[in-house]
Swiss-Prot record:
Low complexity composition bias: residue spans: 601-612
Organism expressing this protein natively: Leptospira interrogans serogroup Icterohaemorrhagiae serovar copenhageni (strain Fiocruz L1-130)
Tree of life domain: Bacteria
InterPro entries: ATPase_NBD, Chaperone_DnaK, Heat_shock_70_CS, HSP70_C_sf, HSP70_peptide-bd_sf, Hsp_70_fam
Protein name according to UniProt: Chaperone protein DnaK
Gene3D superfamilies for the chain: 1.20.1270.10, 3.30.420.40, Actin, Chain A, domain 4, Substrate Binding Domain Of DNAk, Chain A, domain 1
Positions of the UniProt region annotated as Disordered: 598-646
UniProt entry keywords in alphabetical sequence: ATP-binding, Chaperone, Nucleotide-binding, Phosphoprotein, Stress response
Sequence similarity: Belongs to the heat shock protein 70 family.
Name of encoding gene: dnaK
Induction per the UniProt record: By stress conditions e.g. heat shock.
Modified residues (Phosphothreonine): T199
Cited NCBIfam families: PRK00290.1, PRK05183.1, prok_dnaK
CDD domains per the UniProt record, alphabetical: ASKHA_NBD_HSP70_DnaK-like
Entry annotated with the keyword Protein transport: no
Length: 646
């Protein structure tokens, strides 16, 4: 029996493609209908049948409420994050569990993972028919800006389809792999501009001697060909209402007809200057049947979709900046996805990068080909290719004052692992709560919560003494694992991040944009919080020193310290940075004077108390928080657990 193949699948919003390595080269496999692409559509008929692909698409107009398309736009998202999609689909979208999404049909309720699994099953069967053997392993592509939940949901869809997902790889990276597969001796910098049916990605890569290294990635998880179709649909609905006074947007079957007509018009306008949209018997009123007959010019189409095209510009500029490159440094721009055929899109690419885009690859098939090549690498069929991908957004945890402390920066090569030592923020704290975040903002509340977990059973100790090592581990699929370990006791808690949903429309891109727009305000707020934390630590240490000093210091010195501690606490409450800095200077001087006096009067063996003076206290991000090996200790957010109530 021949060695089991690892197939490559491009699970697209609009269409899906399957490919496999044969004789050292990738081959795109035709489906049972003789097509190399399969519509990512699933339908449930009145007879109890499940139709997938072209057969499902063919009956969509007459069975709109039971025909699910663009499921990828819902996968890994909360219901309230899908409001714009829900307005433009012909099927019913309902709540699943706490916050998830399901599709309601006559055959039952289905999650986006289940619908995607049906499409993957079609791809799996297509490969098995071609290879003449069972297929159980696959590499599946996802948009580069898919978050952890969406990647896991895609893996779940594969598992439902009976596939062991050997690797999740980013679509632009897969495209670069396909483009450079036969150019291993060429050293070049390329940009992959990927505008698909539901998502947009831009990745900057460097190709050198068979190594494909992603330098940066950016994008918009809710921008694609569907949005161009919707723009045409909304124009048709508005024009028809102006002409007849009838709103045709409420009927699901009519919406499906409009969707197909809009998609057809969009495609035609890539090759012609105008197109005729003719939908007879679109509706009726008391005077009889009504027909929709309109002419859409390319100029009007460009006007309707200009804002959509422009939304791809800033991600391109950000990706270049993050890669440390200028547009002139890019040797080739590769176009991927069906929507890149739109002339206005190609013109924007030319403007941004200053060169004609490379059109040598098939934009519909190149991603699946790259997935097959990666499958060949994992199966041992391809040995001279190395793929180095990145994580698109920064990861970290919330620390004292509501600050996000980043452990892994965006565009870090994966797989990767990073640890940092944190400490407690209160005396005798027996538990810490780890709040895992994703995003670029300085404050935790402005970033995306990926999950929370607790590490309990920490032995009683003064704040700052326990050492809690938090470790982030991102695997080659871009999926996040987090652990927290008490270095004193060895107790450890591990989780794989499993949030209830994915990100909202434009949310990941919005994180980066908001970070840039609010950079100054975020920085100022963070500086105030860090100054407050430092002053709090100094105050705590001084108070402890005074209490332990006893009669080693005089009454006047004690009163001076007490007054300064009161003034420091008032400064902490004020949020006035200048006042906080002034209090820090004053309390540092007093603390140093008292510590010196106590030290000079101490008996041998008492130095440790003095050493715990102004800079020895725990809880600050920047002062006196070092482990024996020099690792930085940062204050962690915490939850106090009452042992008597357990």
């Amino acid at each position: 029996m021949s060695k089991e193949k690892i197939i490559g699948i491009d699970l697209g919003t609009t269409n899906s493609v399957v490919s496999v390595m044969e004789g050292g080269d990738p081959v795109v496999i035709q489906n049972s209908e003789g097509a190399r692409t399969t519509p990512s559509i699933v339908a449930f008929t009145a007879k109890g049948e499940t139709l997938i692909g072209q057969f499902a698409k063919n009956q969509a107009i007459t069975n709109a409420v039971n025909t699910i398309r663009s499921a990828k736009r819902f996968i890994g998202r909360r219901l309230n994050e899908c409001e714009s999609e829900m307005k433009h689909v012909s099927y019913k979208v309902i709540r699943s569990g706490n916050e998830g999404v399901k599709f309601e049909t006559s055959a039952g309720e289905f999650t986006p993972q289940e619908i995607s699994a049906r499409v993957l099953m079609k791809m799996k069967q297509t490969a098995e028919d071609y290879l003449g053997q069972k297929v159980t392993k696959a590499v599946i592509t996802v948009p580069a800006y898919f978050n952890d939940e969406q990647r896991q949901a895609t893996k779940d869809a594969g598992r439902i389809a009976g596939l062991e997902v050997e690797r999740i790889i980013n679509e632009p990276t897969a495209a670069a792999l396909a483009y450079g597969f036969d150019k291993k001796n060429v050293n070049s910098k390329i940009a992959v501009y990927d505008l698909g049916g539901g998502t947009f990605d831009i990745s900057i890569l460097e190709l050198a001697d068979g190594v494909f290294e992603v330098k940066s990635t950016n994008g918009d998880t809710h921008l694609g060909g569907d949005d161009f179709d919707m723009a045409i649909m909304e124009w048709m609905i508005s024009e028809f209402k102006n002409q007849t006074g009838i709103d045709i947007s409420a009927d699901k079957n009519t919406v499906q007809r409009l969707k197909e007509a809009a998609e057809k018009a969009k495609i035609e306008l890539s090759g012609t200057m105008s197109t005729q949209i003719n939908l007879p018997f679109i509706t009726a009123d008391a005077s009889g049947p009504k027909h929709l007959d309109m002419t859409l010019t390319r100029a009007k189409f460009d006007q309707l979709t200009k804002s959509l095209v422009d939304r791809t510009r800033i991600p391109c500029e950000n990706a270049l900046r993050d890669a440390g490159l200028k547009a002139s440094d890019i040797n080739e721009v590769i176009l991927v996805g069906g929507s890149i055929r739109i002339p206005a899109v190609q013109e924007l690419v030319k403007q941004v990068f200053g060169k004609e885009p490379n059109k040598s690859v098939n934009p519909d098939e190149v991603v699946a080909i790259g997935a097959a090549i990666q499958g060949g690498v994992l199966a041992g069929e391809v040995s001279d290719v190395l793929l180095l991908d990145v994580t698109p957004l920064s990861l970290g945890i919330e620390t004292l004052g509501g600050v996000m402390t980043k452990l892994i920066e965006r565009n870090t090569t994966i797989p990767t692992k990073k640890s940092q030592v944190f400490s407690t923020a209160a005396d005798n704290q027996s538990a810490v709560s780890i709040h895992v975040l994703q995003g670029e903002r300085e404050m935790a509340s402005a970033n995306r919560t990926l999950g929370r977990f607790d590490l309990i059973g920490i032995p009683p100790a003064p704040r700052g003494v326990p050492q809690i090592e938090v470790t982030f581990d991102i695997d080659a699929n871009g999926i996040v694992h987090v652990s927290a370990k008490d270095l004193g006791t060895g107790k450890e808690q591990k989780i794989r991040i499993e949030s209830s949903s994915g990100l909202s429309e434009d949310e990941i891109q919005k994180m980066v944009k908001d970070a840039e727009a609010h950079a100054a305000a975020d920085k100022a707020q963070r500086e105030v919080i860090e100054a407050k934390n430092e002053l709090d630590t100094l105050t705590y240490s001084l108070e402890k020193t005074v209490n332990e000093a006893g009669d080693k210091i005089g009454a006047n010195e004690k009163q001076l310290a007490t007054d300064e501690i009161k003034r420091a606490r008032e400064a902490i409450e004020s949020n006035d940075k200048a006042r906080i800095e002034s209090a820090k200077a004053s309390i540092s001087k007093i603390a140093t004077d008292i510590a010196s006096k106590v030290y000079s009067q101490s008996a041998p063996g008492a130095e440790q108390a003095a050493a715990g003076g102004p800079n020895g206290g725990a809880g600050s991000n920047d002062q006196g928080n070092s482990t024996n090996n020099g690792e930085k200790v940062v204050d962690a957010d915490y939850t106090v657990v009452d042992d008597e109530k357990k």
